[in-house]
A protein has these predicted regions:
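A recurrent domain-boundary module in secreted/ectodomain proteins
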Residues: 142-148, 331-356, 434-438, 451-453, ...
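Sequence contexts marking disulfide-bonded cysteines in secreted/extracellular proteins
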Residues: 7, 199, 231, 456-458
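Short, solvent-exposed loop/turn segments at secondary-structure boundaries
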Residues: 57-58, 229-233
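Charged helix-capping and loop-helix junction motifs
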Residues: 233-239
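HKD-type phospholipase D/PLD-like phosphodiesterase module
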Residues: 1-13, 24-212, 220, 248-251, ...
Length: 481
């Protein structure tokens, strides 16, 4: 999560030029900052995606921001799908700003409130970096110039065709004065930086960094495609490189977005945690990121290798991003830089909430951790049984029902009233109370009599009261004799 102040500060410091290539450009604060820059005589250039995958209102808003800047003197271009031919790129999905000739901002997040939340608001987990280097800036500058050439058929100048609907107005600034909630420390040490560009060299460079891993590999990504939908072959070369690393003994951790988790996501989690880890003995774990009050979902696309190399960029971990989109990123080798991102990764890795379910077994990670179950795997190692179907305490309720009713999976009698959790339903029915209330209360009908005395004790090892005492009052038990 970052603040718009991070970018606004850098925009305010521009001396000659600002070049913004972005998929979604929707931040009023950043637009106002660029308007101020134009007022100071700064040359501002934007390249935006014409066909964003979002609602019509969002597309209209993007056109509004672009039109305001165009009217103020900015050079605004759109990447389009030209008629009569295919564009070389499906989308411009970049998140990059080049300031003057010596500084680059690269991010996983768009310029919008969900990626750059105003002060006090929640947003996505994103990774961003400012790089102060004339050499690196020159490389990115040459790449940006290629996509700023409106003579190319897939680049179109802003015009009336891209105006917003009548009545659209630029929202006011948020007034936030926040700072980046993670470190804003400037790291002045030397770093090795490899600029990457999709579809040109990004896949080769990312796989190369994974193949060079020796000790550890952390991946923080919105998603990781198992199937390779574009290009040659059906299997993801990224996933193949990750598995090769695990087979070399590298400690692999994969953190994925839980917000849009689907069957493919849980299939990948099961592949890594069950097949790679349990069956093949590889030290690899996949997990879904839990949320917090400040972080709503994982929108990142990053990687850390051996605690000293970090990938920051706009490219998702799938074939479309790597082979069909225009994307920008950087692989930075510096232990002090990587440590900042590793601290963020570990925070996300360890956090739990009440909803996230990594293994898809319908038991939230937090509940499984509290009760000593496995948050990362749905099936029981060496069996075909699912963890949710087990009844470890033998009280007649499987783990799924224990969770739903508020019971404890390793305690036959959660409320200590001498009635097994699995028998509470009968007493709850008699008392006209929900079963969940009976499991949690020793006096569910609030009559001052302990439920175990009123209904009869059913916990294993105790004598169950005779339902027909008058018929059997003259009989003796083994204990009497």
């Amino acid at each position: 999560v970052g603040s718009e102040m991070c970018i606004r500060d850098r925009i305010d410091g521009a001396q000659s030029s600002l070049r913004v290539h972005i998929y979604e450009f929707l931040s009023p604060d950043v637009t106002h900052a660029l308007l101020d820059a134009l007022g100071r005589g700064i040359e501002v250039t934007l390249v935006l995606e014409e066909g964003i995958l979002d609602s019509s209102s969002v597309s209209n808003s993007q056109r509004g921001h672009a039109s305001v800047l165009d009217e103020a003197g900015a050079l605004v271009y759109w990447m389009v799908d030209p008629s009569g031919m295919s564009s070389p790129f499906t989308y411009i999905h970049s998140k990059i700003i080049l300031r003057d000739s010596d500084q680059v901002w690269i991010s996983s997040g768009n310029i919008k409130d969900s990626s750059l939340p105003p002060d006090g608001e929640s947003g996505n987990r994103e990774w961003s970096v400012f790089i102060d280097s004339e050499e690196v800036a020159a490389i990115f500058s040459s790449w940006l110039s290629w996509d700023e050439d409106h003579e190319k058929r897939y680049i179109r100048e802003h015009g009336s065709w891209a105006y917003p609907s009548l009545g659209w107005e630029l929202p006011p600034m948020s007034g936030t004065q926040s700072t980046d909630p993670t470190s804003r420390e400037t790291l002045t040490n030397q770093a090795s930086i490899t600029p990457i560009l999709c579809p040109d060299n990004c896949l080769i460079e990312i796989i190369g960094a994974i193949d060079a891993s020796v000790d550890s590999l952390e991946i923080s990504a919105q998603y990781l495609d198992v199937d390779w939908y574009w290009g040659e072959g059906d299997d993801s070369p990224l996933l193949g490189a990750i598995k090769r690393a695990a087979e070399r003994g590298v400690d692999v951790r994969i953190l994925l977005n839980a917000f849009y988790a689907d069957d493919e996501t849980w299939s990948l989690v099961d592949t890594v945690n069950a097949e790679w880890n349990d069956d093949q003995g590889l030290n690899a774990t996949a997990r879904l990121m839990s949320t917090s009050d400040r972080i709503t979902k994982l929108h990142n696309k990053g990687m850390i290798v051996d605690g000293e190399t970090v990938l920051v960029g706009s490219m998702n971990w799938g074939s479309s991003a790597m082979l069909r989109n225009r994307e920008h990123g950087a692989i930075i080798t510096s232990q002090s830089v990587a440590s900042q991102f590793l601290a963020s990764f570990n925070e996300d890795w360890d956090r739990v909430d009440e909803r996230t379910d990594t293994d898809g077994d319908t038991l939230p990670d937090m509940w499984e951790l509290i009760h000593g179950l496995d948050r990362d795997r749905a099936s029981v190692a060496g069996t075909a049984l699912s963890e949710q179907s087990l009844d470890p305490d033998g009280d007649g309720l499987d783990n799924r029902m224990e969770f739903l009713l508020g019971g404890e999976p390793f305690n036959q009698d959660t409320d200590g009233d001498c009635i097994r959790d699995g028998d509470e339903w009968e007493f709850a029915t008699q008392s006209l109370r929900p079963e969940s209330a009976a499991i949690a209360s020793g006096d569910v009908n609030q009559n001052g009599v302990d439920d175990g005395l009123e209904f009869g004790c059913t916990v294993d090892g105790d004598v169950v009261p005779d339902p027909n005492p008058e018929e059997n009052q003259n009989q003796t038990t083994d204990e009497d004799e």
